[in-house]
Amino acid sequence: MISLNHYLIVAALMFVIGLVGVMKRQNLIMLFFSTEILLNAANVALVAISSFYNDIGGQIFAMFIIAIAASEMAVGLGLLILWYKKRHSIEIDSLSTMRDE
């Protein structure tokens, strides 16, 4: 039987992987993927805890997080495509030229 601790350990590992990805990556696409891993780690923890306490509130909140993450990804990738067409780079360092314009 898989206990609550197992789910929380998986969520913590996912959160650490996402956090390391956010801090170490220079590519904006990988930065978006890392934030998605962070949000999914929170979802795993919310669903596991709400299932453990037989409360549906955490699962509903996880659905809201999924919807917000999808809209964030759509807007972010749209902006990223426009930035790539203009600058031909998706590195974080290329964003510093935005304040010069």
From Swiss-Prot:
One of its GO terms (molecular function) is NADH:ubiquinone reductase (non-electrogenic) activity. Keywords: Cell inner membrane, Cell membrane, Membrane, NAD, Quinone, Translocase, Transmembrane, Transmembrane helix, Transport, Ubiquinone. Its main location: membrane. Gene3D superfamilies: 1.10.287.3510. It holds the Pfam family Oxidored_q2. The chain crosses the membrane at residues 2-22, 29-49, 63-83. It is found in: Cell inner membrane. One of its GO terms (cellular component) is plasma membrane. Its EC number is 7.1.1.-. GO terms for biological process: ATP synthesis coupled electron transport. It is a multi-pass membrane protein. It catalyses: a quinone + NADH + 5 H(+)(in) = a quinol + NAD(+) + 4 H(+)(out). It comes from the Bacteria. InterPro entries: NADH_UbQ_OxRdtase_chain4L/K, NUOK/Mnh_C1-like. NDH-1 is composed of 14 different subunits. Subunits NuoA, H, J, K, L, M, N constitute the membrane sector of the complex. Belongs to the complex I subunit 4L family. NDH-1 shuttles electrons from NADH, via FMN and iron-sulfur (Fe-S) centers, to quinones in the respiratory chain. The immediate electron acceptor for the enzyme in this species is believed to be ubiquinone. Couples the redox reaction to proton translocation (for every two electrons transferred, four hydrogen ions are translocated across the cytoplasmic membrane), and thus conserves the redox energy in a proton gradient. This is NADH-quinone oxidoreductase subunit K.
